Swiss-Prot record:
GO cellular component labels: cytoplasm
The species this protein was found in: Burkholderia cenocepacia (strain ATCC BAA-245 / DSM 16553 / LMG 16656 / NCTC 13227 / J2315 / CF5610)
Gene3D superfamilies, per database record: SecB-like
Name of the molecule in the record: Protein-export protein SecB
Gene responsible for this protein: secB
Chain's role: One of the proteins required for the normal export of preproteins out of the cell cytoplasm. It is a molecular chaperone that binds to a subset of precursor proteins, maintaining them in a translocation-competent state. It also specifically binds to its receptor SecA.
Gene Ontology MF terms: unfolded protein binding
Keywords assigned: Chaperone, Cytoplasm, Protein transport, Translocation, Transport
Protein's cellular compartments: Cytoplasm
Assembly mode: Homotetramer, a dimer of dimers. One homotetramer interacts with 1 SecA dimer.
Coiled coil: none
Cysteine pairings via disulfide bonds: none
Protein transport among keywords: yes
Family stated for the protein in its record: Belongs to the SecB family.
Matching InterPro entries: SecB, SecB-like_sf
Length: 163
């Protein structure tokens, strides 16, 4: 094999909106409320190996806005990307898939959620940046804690993508 074939390779094949739903269970009455809504945001990352060097990474976001105890809206969205990743050592692969890929996808998710919220007739909500490295490290610590409690060795098995 030539040196070119053994070079680390990272390529975004596709970025796409995999799923989105918006619910407004209390419309139109909720538009008459004067109080500011409370907003709750949840974000999750999942990754699947589709082929030897091809991964699908999905960043999911859920935004729930409530006025008092009434739901103004609930939006759930999944922004996905297909990444071609080759010649990367296993110990670097999980962080690449768990940190770099979600960091690439999140601005798309944030934009799609903000657009859906304003199109639904609500004031814009701009999601803050997310430190995916901290999220990854937190998830890794949880896995190590679970593995320790189960009597297994610490860390994710080699080649396992953290979900």
């Amino acid at each position: 094999m030539s040196d070119v074939e053994n070079q680390p390779f990272f390529n975004i094949q596709r970025v796409y909106l995999k799923d989105m739903s918006l619910e407004q269970p209390n419309s139109p009455a909720i538009f008459l409320e004067q109080d500011m809504p409370s907003v709750e945001v949840e974000v999750d990352v999942k990754a699947d190996r589709l082929a030897e060097s091809v991964f699908e990474v999905v960043v999911s976001g859920t935004v729930t806005a409530k006025v008092k105890d009434k739901v103004a809206f609930l939006i759930e969205a999944k922004q996905a990307g297909i990444f071609d990743i080759r010649n990367i050592p296993d110990e670097q692969l999980d962080p690449l898939v768990g940190i770099a890929c979600p960091t690439i996808l999140f601005p798309y998710l944030r934009s799609n959620i903000a657009d859906a919220i304003t199109r639904a007739g609500f004031p814009p909500i701009h999601l803050a940046e997310i430190n995916f490295q901290a999220l990854y490290e937190q998830r890794l610590a949880q896995l190590q804690q679970q593995a320790g409690a189960a009597g297994a060795p610490n860390g994710a098995p080699n080649g396992t993508t953290l979900n």
